[in-house]
Swiss-Prot record:
It comes from Saccharopolyspora erythraea (strain ATCC 11635 / DSM 40517 / JCM 4748 / NBRC 13426 / NCIMB 8594 / NRRL 2338). GO terms for molecular function: ATP binding; DNA binding; DNA ligase (ATP) activity; metal ion binding. Keywords: ATP-binding, Cell cycle, Cell division, DNA damage, DNA recombination, DNA repair, DNA replication, Ligase, Magnesium, Metal-binding, Nucleotide-binding. Belongs to the ATP-dependent DNA ligase family. PROSITE patterns: DNA_LIGASE_A1 (PS00697), DNA_LIGASE_A3 (PS50160). The active site is at residue 212. InterPro entries: ATP-dep_DNA_ligase, DNA_ligae_ATP-dep_bac/arc, DNA_ligase_ATP-dep, DNA_ligase_ATP-dep_C, DNA_ligase_ATP-dep_cent, DNA_ligase_ATP-dep_CS, DNA_ligase_ATP-dep_N, DNA_ligase_N_sf. It catalyses: ATP + (deoxyribonucleotide)n-3'-hydroxyl + 5'-phospho-(deoxyribonucleotide)m = (deoxyribonucleotide)n+m + AMP + diphosphate. It comes from the Bacteria. The gene is lig. Gene3D superfamilies: DNA ligase, ATP-dependent, N-terminal domain, DNA ligase/mRNA capping enzyme, Nucleic acid-binding proteins. Coiled coil: none annotated. It is an enzyme of class 6 (ligase). This is Probable DNA ligase. ATP binds at residues 210, 217, 232, 261, 296, 367, 373.
C-alpha cells in the first residue's frame, strides 16, 4: 500500500532535476511499487491530474482552508482517490459547505508537504502537459516494455492512467489491445513550423498543400446515426453544433472518423473572428451563427482503421465520402504551384498553409516533421504565467502578461518575455476577471496564475538574453488572441522558441 507521501516525494524529486533520465527513473521507481488498484490514481497524481476531471473545488474554497497539519504521513493513494471521488459526487443545496468540510477532513490528515501538494493538485496548478512524454517513458521502464508500444496505446486511449494500468498489468500484449474506437476521441496529429515554404517542400517532396484555416480543430466520429464531435483537447461539443451533426449523418458511409477544421464565415465567404467560432462551443452559444466544416483527413471508414496508411490513401478515402467538404488543397511537388495556394489562402483571409508528406502515417498526439505549417509571420502559442496591474489608461486592469514556453523535459513553463501590446479594452476587461479566478498568489504588482491559459503571440523574432531562464527573449511581441481550444500541453516548447529567426516572408526561400 503506497502512501501519498511517496507520491509527494517523487513529485518533488522530478521538479528538482533538469535531467530527463533522472525524472524517468524516479517516476518508474514509484510506478513499479503501486498495487493494481493504485496504478490509475497514482499515475494521475504524478502527472498532476485528477482521473475524473475537476473535483468541483475552486481556489476560493482551497485558500480559505487552513487546518493543522498531521505530524506523520498516513494517507494512502487509494484513500485520497476515494476522497476526491466523494468530493466530485457532492451536489444539491449546501454542496459547497459539504465539500469544504470533506476537504478540511482530508487536509487535516495530511502532513504540511502533503497539504501543499493536494491544494495544488485540486487547484490544477500541478497539471503539466509537458510531463506526458516523461510519464510515458517511465511507464515503459516500470513495465519493461517498448516505449513505442506505450506511446501508441496512449495515442489511442488519450488517458495516462488507462495506459499505465494496461502496461503494468498485461505488458505489450494488453497495450496492443488498444484500437481506434469510433466514439472515443484520439489525440490529434500536430504539425511543426517551417520557416519558409521552400524549406517544407524541400524536406517532404510530394505533398498535400492545404489552407491553414483560421478555425477550430474538430474530430468527428460517426457509427450509424450516432455522431460525436470533439475539440482538439478532446472535449465533446456534439450538442452545441447540430448543423455539423446533421451534415455528418448525411455522408454516404456506415462509420467514419474525420479530422478537420470548422469556422464561421461572413457573407463574402471570409472567416469571421476566431472568438465567434469558439463561442459556438459554449453553453450560451449563438445558434444563428452557422459553422462550416472542412475536413483534411480520414482515420476510419466503414470498419477499416486507416491510421497507419500513407496520407495519399487516407485522402482517397476522404474523397470517396466527403469530397464536398474537403479543405482547399493541391497535391504537388512543385514549389511554384505550392506558392500559388499559399497566396490564395492569405487572400481568402486564412493563416497560411499546411504542407504534409503524402507518405506520412497519422501519428496521433505527436508533433512530427512530416506535417509542417507555414505562415507569413512568426507566431507562438505560449502559456500565461502571470500578469501585472496596468498604469495610466490600463489602471485597474491586469495588463502586462508574463509568457512561458513548454519545457519538453516535463518541468514548469519557462518564461520567455512579457507583453501588453495588442490587448483591446475588451480583452483587458475579460482577462482581469478571468485571471483572478485562476490566481495562485499575488504580490504588490503581479497576479500569478495556474499555468493553463494559452495565448497566441505574434513576434518579430527572438534574441539571446540572460534575463530569462531559457536564455532567449521575445522581440516586439504582441497578443493576437487567446486559444481556448488549446491546453498547456499544446503550447510551443522552449526549443521551438529558440528556433525562431528574424522576420521574413514565409513563402520565400533563404
Amino acid at each position: 500500500m503506497v502512501l501519498l507521501s511517496d507520491v509527494v516525494r517523487t513529485s518533488a524529486e522530478v521538479s528538482a532535476t533538469r535531467s530527463r533520465k533522472s525524472k524517468v527513473a524516479a517516476i518508474a521507481g514509484l510506478l513499479s511499487r503501486l498495487g493494481e488498484a493504485e496504478v490509475g490514481p497514482g499515475t494521475a497524481f504524478l502527472a498532476g491530474e485528477l482521473r475524473g476531471g475537476r473535483a468541483g473545488v475552486g481556489w476560493a474554497t482551497l485558500s480559505a482552508l487552513d487546518p493543522a497539519a498531521a505530524g506523520e504521513p498516513s494517507l494512502t493513494v487509494a484513500e485520497v482517490d476515494a476522497a476526491i471521488d466523494a468530493l466530485r459526487e457532492i451536489g444539491g443545496a449546501g454542496s459547497g459547505q459539504r465539500r469544504a468540510e470533506l476537504l478540511a477532513d482530508l487536509l487535516a490528515r495530511a502532513t504540511a508537504a502533503e497539504q501543499e501538494f493536494l491544494v495544488r493538485l485540486l487547484g490544477g496548478e500541478l497539471r503539466q502537459g509537458a510531463l506526458e512524454g516523461v510519464m510515458l517513458e517511465a511507464i515503459a521502464a516500470a513495465a519493461g516494455v517498448r516505449p513505442d508500444a506505450v506511446r501508441r496505446a496512449f495515442m489511442l486511449s488519450g488517458r495516462l492512467p488507462a495506459t499505465a494500468e494496461a502496461a503494468l498489468r498485461g505488458g505489450e500484449e494488453e497495450l496492443g489491445g488498444f484500437r481506434l474506437e469510433v466514439g472515443r476521441p484520439l489525440r490529434p496529429m500536430l504539425a511543426s513550423p517551417a520557416e519558409t515554404l521552400d524549406e517544407a517542400m524541400t524536406e517532404l517532396g510530394e505533398v498535400s498543400v492545404e489552407y491553414k484555416m483560421d478555425g477550430a480543430r474538430i474530430q468527428v466520429h460517426r457509427d450509424g446515426d450516432d455522431v460525436h464531435i470533439y475539440t482538439r483537447t478532446l472535449r465533446e461539443i456534439t450538442r452545441h453544433v447540430p448543423e455539423l451533426v446533421e451534415l455528418v449523418r448525411g455522408l454516404d458511409c456506415r462509420s467514419i472518423v474525420l479530422d478537420g477544421e470548422t469556422l464561421a464565415l461572413d457573407d463574402s465567404g471570409r472567416p469571421r473572428p476566431f472568438q465567434e467560432t469558439m463561442g459556438r462551443f459554449g453553453a450560451q452559444s449563438p445558434r444563428d451563427l452557422l459553422l462550416h466544416p472542412y475536413f483534411f483527413d480520414c482515420l476510419h471508414l466503414d470498419g477499416r482503421d486507416l491510421l497507419d496508411l500513407p496520407l495519399r490513401d487516407r485522402l482517397t478515402a476522404l474523397e470517396e465520402v466527403a469530397a464536398d467538404h474537403r479543405i482547399p488543397a493541391v497535391l504537388t511537388a512543385d514549389a511554384e504551384h505550392a506558392s500559388g495556394i499559399f497566396d490564395d489562402a492569405l487572400e481568402a483571409g486564412h493563416e497560411g498553409v499546411m504542407v504534409k508528406s503524402l507518405d506520412s502515417a497519422y501519428a496521433a498526439g505527436r508533433r512530427g516533421r512530416t506535417w509542417r505549417k507555414v505562415k507569413p509571420s512568426h507566431t507562438l502559442d505560449l502559456v500565461v504565467l502571470a500578469a501585472e496591474w496596468g498604469h495610466g489608461r490600463r489602471s485597474g486592469y491586469l495588463s502586462n502578461l508574463h509568457l512561458g514556453a513548454r519545457d519538453p523535459d516535463g518541468g514548469p513553463p519557462i518564461m520567455v518575455g512579457k507583453t501588453f501590446k495588442g490587448l483591446t479594452d475588451e480583452l483587458l476587461a475579460w482577462q482581469t476577471e478571468e485571471f483572478q479566478r485562476r490566481e495562485t498568489h499575488r504580490d504588490d504588482w503581479t497576479v500569478h496564475l495556474v499555468p493553463e491559459l494559452v495565448v497566441e503571440i505574434e513576434l518579430d523574432g527572438v534574441q539571446t538574453s540572460t534575463r530569462y531562464p531559457g536564455g532567449v527573449a521575445l522581440r516586439f511581441a504582441r497578443v493576437l488572441r487567446y486559444r481556448p481550444d488549446k491546453d498547456a500541453a499544446s503550447a510551443d516548447t522552449i526549443d521551438a522558441v529558440r528556433e525562431v529567426r528574424g522576420p521574413q516572408r514565409a513563402a520565400e526561400g533563404g
